[in-house]
Amino acid sequence: MAVNVSRVIKTLGDDFTVIDASGHILGRLSSKIAKRLLNGERIVVVNAEKAVITGDKYMVFERYKEKYDRGSKEKGPYFPRHPERIFKRTVRGMLPWKSSRGRDAYRRLRVFMGVPEELQGREFEKIEDALLEKVSKTDKYVTLAEVSRYLGFRGV
């Protein structure tokens, strides 16, 4: 499924923040983004596949595999395999999804794998509170790309 990035970015307007997710802890970054979305900010996340999840590799794999296997093809719940969709789903879990306020906030978020050509020259923001090297001293972590590959995604 090809995404028309220029059309997607035009829908956001001119005043949006670009955040580079590489090296950030997924949960911490998602909570910061969710709060900013609720405050009305428009956010674009790039390099979503390079976000990390801390913990033992196989424990993380099993936790995500259990979520993915939970639903049936007919009834759901449907859990994504694409790294950018897993990222969006994580942010969605931190928003009041059942209210219009949460859904409106969710619509102000755009997530991309890699850096689209339209965003090459822009300044990327890093969230210091969510950086793995600043927050955690652990060497046990998995990237979102590895989790996606384990779930069966072949694009990374």
Curated annotation (Swiss-Prot):
One of its GO terms (biological process) is negative regulation of translation. GO terms for molecular function: mRNA binding; structural constituent of ribosome. SUPFAM superfamilies: Ribosomal protein L13. GO terms for cellular component: cytosolic large ribosomal subunit. The keyword Ribonucleoprotein applies. It holds the Pfam family Ribosomal_L13. Keywords: Ribonucleoprotein, Ribosomal protein. Part of the 50S ribosomal subunit. Belongs to the universal ribosomal protein uL13 family. This protein is one of the early assembly proteins of the 50S ribosomal subunit, although it is not seen to bind rRNA by itself. It is important during the early stages of 50S assembly. This is Large ribosomal subunit protein uL13. It comes from Archaeoglobus fulgidus (strain ATCC 49558 / DSM 4304 / JCM 9628 / NBRC 100126 / VC-16). The gene is rpl13.
